[in-house]
C-alpha cells in the first residue's frame, strides 16, 4: 500500500522459531515436497509447521470424531496435538496424522483399530490417499476470555484479571443491583 511506500509491511515466518530438531527435519521434508510437487496441501502444512504454539491449538478426540464423520477411509491431518476426551465413550476407526498425541488419545485410537501417523509417514502415503485438514479451536484458550471491551463497561462479558475469586474481589459494586448498580 502507499503508506509503506510500496513495501509490504506484513511479516511471514520462513522457518519455525523453535529449535526442535525433529520439527526442523519435518520442515526440511515438506520444503522439498512443496518445491517438487505443485500440491497446495503440502504448502499449507509447511506454513502451519512454522506457526507459534498459540496458532497450533490442540484438537480433542471428540472434535476429531465429529469432523471425520462420513469421511471414512480418509486421513485426518492436524498440525498440532490430538488430546483425549473422556466424554467420548466409543471411538470409531480413524486414521490421524498429528505432531503429537497424548498417551491416552493414542491408546484409544489404536484400540479402536485406527492409526496414529506422523508427518513423515504421511508424506510416504500422500499421493495415494485422501486427506482432511483439521485445526483446533484457536479461541478456546483461557487467555482469550480476558480480551474484548473492558470488564465493567455495559454488555461486556470480558473476564477481569482478579488476584483471587473471593467475596470482596470485583463481586459486589457493578455486579449486582443491591450494591449500587449492575452492568
Swiss-Prot record:
Biased composition, class Basic residues, residue ranges: 156-166, 173-183
Superkingdom: Eukaryota
GO MF assignments: mRNA binding; structural constituent of ribosome
Classification via InterPro entries: Ribosomal_eL18, Ribosomal_eL18/eL18-A/B/_CS, Ribosomal_uL15/eL18, Ribosomal_uL15/eL18_sf
This protein's UniProt keywords: Ribonucleoprotein, Ribosomal protein
GO terms of biological process kind: translation
Coiled coil start-end: none
GO cellular component: cytosolic large ribosomal subunit
A Pfam family the protein falls into: Ribosomal_L18
Region ranges (Disordered): 146-183
Recorded family membership: Belongs to the eukaryotic ribosomal protein eL18 family.
Protein name per the record: Large ribosomal subunit protein eL18
Amino acid at each position: 500500500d502507499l503508506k509503506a511506500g510500496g513495501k509490504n509491511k506484513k511479516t511471514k515466518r520462513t522457518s519455525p522459531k523453535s529449535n526442535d530438531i525433529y520439527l526442523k527435519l519435518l520442515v526440511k521434508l515438506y520444503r522439498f515436497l512443496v518445491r517438487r510437487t505443485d500440491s497446495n496441501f503440502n504448502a499449507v502444512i509447511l506454513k502451519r509447521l512454522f506457526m507459534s504454539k498459540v496458532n497450533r491449538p490442540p484438537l480433542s478426540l471428540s472434535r476429531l470424531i465429529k469432523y471425520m464423520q462420513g469421511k471414512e477411509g480418509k486421513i485426518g491431518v492436524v498440525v498440532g496435538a490430538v488430546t483425549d476426551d473422556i466424554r467420548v465413550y466409543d471411538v470409531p476407526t480413524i486414521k490421524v496424522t498429528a505432531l503429537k498425541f497424548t498417551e491416552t488419545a493414542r491408546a484409544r485410537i489404536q484400540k479402536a483399530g485406527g492409526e496414529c501417523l506422523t508427518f513423515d509417514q504421511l508424506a510416504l502415503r500422500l499421493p495415494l490417499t485422501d486427506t482432511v485438514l483439521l485445526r483446533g479451536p484457536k479461541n478456546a484458550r483461557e487467555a482469550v476470555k480476558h480480551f474484548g471491551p473492558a470488564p465493567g463497561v455495559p454488555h461486556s462479558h470480558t473476564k477481569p484479571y482478579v488476584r483471587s475469586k473471593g467475596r470482596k474481589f470485583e463481586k459486589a459494586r457493578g455486579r449486582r443491583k443491591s450494591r449500587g448498580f449492575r452492568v
